[in-house]
């Protein structure tokens, strides 16, 4: 709950939580608000864009000729395309979580690196969304319990009247 002291409203308990992210034995801090229900809206806006970038990666090799050797120009163009897609993906993920997720969770390499056939960005999103799912569920249960305690005397009375 917010507290008021000397005309100052303290909403610090609504701030982000600190999570430690381990990458190759190193711990980095990531700040998230895992009870932010508006993430659902952001997911609905960002997922189509991520899928579009996934489609772009399928056509990334279109720049390559059918020759056995790759030219320097092809390497430069391929690198440019990969870099653009990676930057777009990082921006979308940071926007999704309203935090510097890409910097903390993927400080090097590409978001399209794979682990057991799964893109790095998918692993990051799935892992962090699990925090949100769990926390939003807990907060919803607390809210329902609180509402029930405040309305129980009215609903119990209404129930008695309707059963007569």
What are these model-predicted stretches?
Residues 2-74:
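Short N-terminal mixed-charge amphipathic segments
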């Amino acid at each position: 709950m917010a507290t008021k002291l000397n005309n100052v409203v303290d909403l610090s308990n609504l701030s982000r939580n600190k999570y430690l992210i381990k990458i190759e034995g190193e711990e980095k801090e990531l700040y998230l608000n895992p009870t932010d229900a508006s993430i659902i809206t952001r997911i609905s806006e960002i997922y189509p864009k991520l899928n579009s970038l996934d489609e772009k990666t399928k056509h990334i090799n279109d720049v390559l000729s059918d020759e056995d050797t790759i030219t320097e120009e092809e390497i430069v163009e391929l690198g440019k395309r990969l870099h653009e897609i990676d930057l777009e993906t990082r921006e979308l993920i940071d926007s999704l979580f309203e935090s510097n997720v890409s910097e903390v969770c993927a400080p090097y390499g590409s978001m399209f690196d794979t682990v057991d056939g799964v893109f790095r960005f998918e692993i990051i999103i799935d892992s962090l969304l699990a925090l949100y799912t769990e926390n939003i569920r807990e907060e919803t249960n607390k809210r329902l319990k609180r509402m029930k305690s405040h309305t129980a005397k009215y609903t119990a009375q209404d129930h008695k009247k309707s059963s007569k």
